[in-house]
Amino acid sequence: KPRPHQFFGLM
């Protein structure tokens, strides 16, 4: 599962 910090990395 992708972690919250990974979502921020996409942006």
From Swiss-Prot:
Location relative to the cell: Secreted
Keyword Secreted in record: yes
GO biological process, one term: chemical synaptic transmission
InterPro entries per the UniProt record, alphabetical: Tachy_Neuro_lke_CS, Tachykinin_dom
Domain of life according to the entry: Eukaryota
Modified residues (Methionine amide): 11
Keyword field: Amidation, Neuropeptide, Neurotransmitter, Secreted
Signal sequence segment: none
Keyword Secreted: yes
Any single GO CC term annotated in Swiss-Prot or TrEMBL for this entry: synapse
Record-linked Pfam families: Tachykinin
Chief subcellular location: secreted
Function, as annotated: Tachykinins are active peptides which excite neurons, evoke behavioral responses, are potent vasodilators and secretagogues, and contract (directly or indirectly) many smooth muscles.
Similarity remark: Belongs to the tachykinin family.
Protein name: Substance P
